[in-house]
Amino acid sequence: DAEHKSEIVHRFNDLKEEKFKGAALITFAQFLHKKPEEEA
């Protein structure tokens, strides 16, 4: 039972990491799009 719980936690952490990467990528993309407008 403890091993099964650990597996769920491990998968949840992987999912959280993937969502964090996705959010960071979107934020970075928006930053790149906004920067030229501010310079112009």
From Swiss-Prot:
Subcellular location, record wording: Secreted
GO MF assignments: lipid binding; metal ion binding
Family: Belongs to the ALB/AFP/VDB family.
Binding of Cu cation, residues: H4
Name of protein: 67 kDa serum albumin
Free-text tissue specificity from the UniProt record: Plasma.
Functional summary from the UniProt entry: Serum albumin, the main protein of plasma, has a good binding capacity for water, Ca(2+), Na(+), K(+), fatty acids, hormones, bilirubin and drugs. Its main function is the regulation of the colloidal osmotic pressure of blood.
Predominant cellular place of this UniProt entry's protein: secreted
Organism in which the protein naturally occurs: Trachemys scripta
Native organism taxonomy: Eukaryota, Metazoa, Chordata, Craniata, Vertebrata
Keywords assigned by UniProt, alphabetized: Copper, Lipid-binding, Metal-binding, Secreted
More info: In the red-eared slider turtle, there are two forms of albumin, ALB-1 and ALB-2.
InterPro entries found in the cross-reference section: Serum_albumin_N (IPR014760)
